[in-house]
Amino acid sequence: MNGDNRPVEDAHYTETGFPYAATGSYMDFYGGAAQGPLNYDHAATMHPQDNLYWTMNTNAYKFGFSGSDNASFYGSYDMNDHLSRMSIGRTNWDYHPMVNVADDPENTVARSVQIGDTDEHSEAEECIANEHDPDSPQVSWQDDIDPDTMTYEELVELGEAVGTESRGLSQELIETLPTKKYKFGSIFSRKRAGERCVICQLKYKIGERQMNLPCKHVYHSECISKWLSINKVCPVCNSEVFGEPSIH
């Protein structure tokens, strides 16, 4: 009570959630008629669905979605999409702008190339380590191979399996060796009737081509050609065909 014996009224301010001034906002909102906000003191408690509907309507007007002039620019889908991203009870500044973080295609390709280079480098290091490892099975297998102690069949199988190595003679050198046809009919040839090719262990037949080595040993031309392409020594005396003869 004051000196005039009149009751002092407390002023209460209500947060309406509208960005406009109180007088202007109500006039614009209700079509130009100045009207105060309705008193909801005696209204029943609003259900969550009703509260959501009221918030959507007020926010729609707040963000400029209402009105016939804005209908062509903002449809109901845009308004609902915008409001669905907002949570009731949170202010606008609580929402951070969404940034679409996408990998740059150039960065993706660079990472793929880097991963590929790392894998290739690891494989290369592993191969080098195996080559220098004396306990490697491959190294042991290669050390156990001695073409000088292998039979013709073993050399042929080895050549077909791993390919011929340049320990033998070239085809041009082999073709320079003298050849002749085997003949049977004379006295001297009868004495050699039981001769066989040491390589294939088959008897010579009339008309078959024979090849004479510098060491005077004779073989089937086909058999000795295959042998010399793998090993350049004579199968009998181990003398090099185009080198110094071995002394036994």
UniProtKB/Swiss-Prot annotation:
Listed GO MF terms: ubiquitin conjugating enzyme binding; ubiquitin-protein transferase activity; zinc ion binding
Reported modifications of this chain: Auto-ubiquitinated.
Pfam families referenced in this protein's UniProt entry, alphabetically: zf-RING_2
Superkingdom per UniProt: Eukaryota
Impact when changing C197S: Loss of ubiquitin ligase activity and enlarged floral organs
Deleted gene: phenotype: Enlarged floral organs (e.g. petals and sepals) and thick stems mainly due to altered numbers of normally sized cells. Enhanced da1-1 phenotype leading to increased seed and organ size.
CDD domains in UniProt: RING-H2_BB-like (cd23115)
Zn finger (RING-type) location: 197-238
The protein's annotated pathway: Protein modification; protein ubiquitination
Subunit text: Interacts with the E2 ubiquitin conjugating enzyme UBC10 via the RING domain. Interacts with DA1.
Protein's recorded name: E3 ubiquitin-protein ligase BIG BROTHER
Source organism per UniProt: Arabidopsis thaliana
